[in-house]
Structures are given as C-alpha cells and as structure tokens.
Amino acid sequence: MSKILIRGAKVLGGEPQDVLIDGETIAEVGNGLSAEGATVVEADGKILLPGLVDLHTHLREPGREDSETVLTGTRAAASGGFTAVFAMANTFPVADTAGVVEQVWRLGKESGYCDVQPIGAVTVGLEGKQLSELGAMHDSAAGVTVFSDDGKCVDDAVIMRRALEYVKAFGGVVAQHAQEPRLTEGAQMNEGIVSAELGLGGWPSVAEESIIARDVLLAEHVGSRVHICHLSTAGSVEIVRWAKSRGIDVTAEVTPHHLLLTDELVRSYNPVYKVNPPLRTERDVLALREALADGTIDIVATDHAPHPHEDKDCEWAAAAMGMVGLETALSVVQQTMVETGLLDWAGVAERMSVKPARIGSLEGHGRPIAAGEPANLTLVDSAYRGVVDPAGFASRSRNTPYEGRELPGRVTHTFLRGRATVVDGKLA
C-alpha cells in the first residue's frame, strides 16, 4: 500500500503537524514523522481539513448531461476540496425509484473523484401528489437517507407530514425546498426596493418563511427530522432559531452565494445572478453569516446548479435559475466567515464536513484527523489570492457569479481514502 507524508500542515488551522497516510487510512499525526518510501507533500503551513461534504448538489445525470455529468461534477467537487457530495433528485428521469438512485450511485463509484450519495425524491416525479418509494430507495444499494423534491417545494401539508412519518422509521430526513408556490408565481427576484425599481416580479421573504414555520411544527408533531435547504432570509433564521429552542429536530443550510451576494447585483440584468431562492438584501446576508457562526444554521451547502451557456445567455425572464458553486465554495466561506473573524478553520470543518456528513448519515466522512481514521482530507493554501476564471473549471458549466472577482484561498490537494484526486491544484 502507498504511503503519503503531509509535512507541516496546520491541522484545522492549529500548529503545524505531520500527517502520515498509509493506504486508505491516517496512520499517525505528530511532529517529525518519517516514513520509508512515502510520497512527501510539503504543506508549508497550509490548512488541513477533513474532506469537505456537500449535502446539496445537482449533478444533472441522468437526463441533462449537457449541463453536467456525474464524472464532471465529481471532478469539480474534488477540485473544490470535496470528498463526498449528495446528488439531488431532479434528474430525467426523476430519482424517485430504487433503480434511478442506484444508477447515480454506481456512476459515482465509477468516477472515482469523490463519493456520490443520491438523494431520493419525496414525491413521484417531483409532482407533490404521491409519495415515492422511500423505503425501497433506503433499502437499495444506494442506501438513501435524505429525501427532497428540491427545485420544488413539498407544499401539500398532508404529503409532507406523511413523508416525515415514513422516514422516521429508518432515521431518514426530509430536506425541504421552502417556497410557497402561490406566493412566488411570476417571481423573478427578491421582493423589495430593487425589484420595484426594475419592474421585476418580486419573490417575498414570507414565501420561504411560511413553509419553514409549517414544517418545523410538523416535524415537532411527528417527532421526525426536517432539514431546510438554502435559507436566504433573516426571518427564516429567526424561525429556525425558535424551533431549535423548542428542541425540534431541525437542521438548516446556507449557500456560499447567499453569504456574499445581494439583490443589488440584479441591477445589471445579468442572468448569472438569477437563482432560487433569489439573492436577498445586505441585512439578510449579515443575518445568515451570524446564524452560521452561532450554529442556528448548521452547514454550508453549495446548491451547485450547472446550466449550459444557452440557458443563461438570454434575457433575464427566460433564463434558468442557478449557479455553479463546488469550485468556489471554500473560498467564499474563507472570505465571508474566516477573514471576518466569525469562524476559525475548525468551525469551517464543522460546517462543511462534520455536520453535513452527520445530517446525511454518511460514514467515513467528516471524521477527525487522527490515527485510524479514513484519509479523506483537503489541503488549503489560505494565503493564496486569485481571480476567478471559469475557463479553468472542471465543471461542464460556467455559470458562476464570481467571474473576474478576486477570492482568497485555493485547494492544493484533495485525498479520497488516501488517494490524491487533486495535486498542486490540478486534478490527478
């Protein structure tokens, strides 16, 4: 078995240490380590984190391979420091059966760049009318534990209650895309001053907040787990904070773009800023950062949503919603959370590795950097500064809102069970 010696890495941002990998496992962590025949990686004070875990990606395969494939998506994930991603169910066909989730799971196994855990649809065809084969997907080779109709809201309260009751039997979780559909008909951006000035249909905060309020109460009533996807408003933060104070089993995520970007960018009418949920106000952005720091929001998830050029190179109203995010996520978190003093690197690891793996019941990821643990690791050059150029992305799509923007930090190495998937910032 191959050995790799990472020399002088700041484990979780602490004092420099050496980490010896033997095969798929961390063999030793300490100072002055040596190993005969080992490949040496000189970390030179770079930050060593457990491999990142993304609870919310859209890999588009099967059905929209023009946007992304499991292979290109996992290459993008590895480039961004991720060793595991959860793939949303809004594919063609929809991942609402054991057969489709097993297909996605097997494609992930074949890619070899990171682990892929499929998310099963809550309802058949994402239509919100009939529960999918939740038990069959859980019992399949893919072992699905997270279920979501993401892209659409499970807006029927009875269906949502039944889903929560069903997944409770095997410790699963329903991940809700909180968007009351009637309140967002014709909506194009956040409802507020900017939407009024631009004459674009407004997307009110209450459309998100009302669903979250309903679903945390349903979860309390059923005694089940609910996860709220991509929180985007200060009001949503307050509802989740209240629910947690009552002991309700709710977790929540925020995307990197909602930690940095605001609806003021929509004044450009550039569809790259069109996303669901929409970019909100500066007040919302600051509330989301504080909530991520204090634990009200549990994790960062990218909501990586690739689209081909033609789906974004059009007028605003006709453009698809979504942004790619796997290759820039850690940099945005460094800028918004670490460099502002809201989180240290141990806190980043907790929110981008440990907790996502825990919420998704994913074994072998989000583990301590210690002897005997799986060697899923990410090495980050936090001193690096660079301008985002989507031409260099591993993703098949280029719809990033950060093109031309300087961001800090760069993943130099990613290790999946002891095998380097990224070396010196390039895919291995």
Regions found by a protein language model. Give the residues of each.
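Histidine/acidic residue-rich metal-binding segments in metalloenzymes
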Residues: 131-300
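Histidine-rich, glycine-flanked metal-binding segment
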Residues: 1-50
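Divalent metal-coordination and catalytic microenvironments
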Residues: 9, 24, 45, 56, ...
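A glycine-rich helix N-cap at a beta->alpha junction
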Residues: 106-122
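Active-site mouth loops of central-metabolism enzymes
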Residues: 55-68, 89-91, 96, 117-130, ...
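Metal-associated gating/positioning segment near the N- to mid-region
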Residues: 46-111
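His/Asp/Glu-enriched, well-ordered alpha-helical/loop segment
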Residues: 197-225, 272, 293, 298-300, ...
